[in-house]
Amino acid sequence: MLGSEVCAVSRCLGVSVSIVFNVSSSEFCAKYQEKQPLLFKKAVSTESFSWRSANEIIERSNVATSDFKLSLGKVLEKHEYIESYIDIGTLRHRLIKPIVYDYLRKGATLIANKIRNESMVGRYARQISEFTGRQVVSSAYAAFGSKDSFRCHWDTRDVFAIQLIGRKRWIVYEPSMVSPLYTQQSKDYEKQYPCPSTPYMDFVLEAGDVFYLPRGWWHNPLPLGEPTFHLAVGTFPAFTMDYLNWVFRQMPEFVEARQSLGDWEGSRKNLAMVAQRLNDLLTAPESYHRFMNEFVSATRVESALAMEIFGDPSIGSVPDHAGIRLCANTSHGLSDGYVIANGTKLNLDKEGMLLIGSIVRQPGISLASLVARFPDADVSKLRHLITELCRQDVLELTDY
């Protein structure tokens, strides 16, 4: 897993953006991940974040998609607050600001889901991704009233709530349905699995706090009648159902699975053989590793663009002070002599495992520090290797 440090730090344009986790990633995974909530008090600095920052995130969101919402008791119809127009032959969409402002004054919550290409949001999300070893998706919530955006519900993903402006009261209840999947929304199951009556937690999340909530835990974040803005970073691992679906897609390779069905007595023997084939495939280590390789290979990490270094033919190497990290959420395969980053599988010899291992254990390590750790290596070749792996989007620069 990446990011074993208690404090993960990222810098851009001289502004420090960091999340201070009060547990290591290994302890978090063992004691908290998918098990119980965890509150990180004063985990982020909010000095560099303002309503101007929040406005810019909303302005750059695609308001026409279903990922952008305005909620007041229910999700409002798009036509109520978005207009379409032709801009020199291009269909565009924009917020009808007077209407949006009016809804916000009445207590509505503005929601932007699946945020991409926002540097500050991306840096927080990347730290959480490295801390958990999982894919992440980021959302933003802005409100000014005292009404909740949704009634008490559970999420089908683990979430890190990062409070950046103002406060929110969180009322949290233990799960009534354990580990719900994305098809098992609380609104469809609340009668069968009702919310407990006694809260597990009732607290105020303040600016700078980060709150981790596992999937399935009932919660109701309540605005307190004051301006509030928070990010929600959801984490997405491979689930057992994903593996089962993958296994079933392999079954047509077996002749028994391709047979037609007749009466029960005629089909029973063949179905028993199918069950044996399925069990053998499902429990084979080779199947599991192949699935995980495919899952990780399909994952993409948005690395920072560095045209002035990798696009300039006169630049032969990344700067010595540049920070280096792996373009992956997890160091999957490293102990077996390979890593997968942005769809590229990189086979490693013993020295390569040590090199990538150093980067994995210390994301953001400088090129100069890497060179110093391998005094017997050919410095010129090492610099060239690191530069080429950055150019191939296997590694990326973090601070240069």
Regions found by a protein language model. Name each.
Residues 3, 12, 23, 33-35, ...:
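Long, charge-rich, low-complexity alpha-helical segments
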Residues 281-360, 383, 387, 398-400:
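Acidic, low-complexity/disordered tracts enriched in E/D and polar residues
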Residues 7, 12-31, 44-209, 218-265:
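Active-site region of the double-stranded beta-helix
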Residues 36, 226, 251-259, 336-338, ...:
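Short acidic (Asp/Glu) and glycine-rich catalytic loops that position anionic groups and cofactors
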Residues 248-297:
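Long, charge-rich alpha-helical interaction segments
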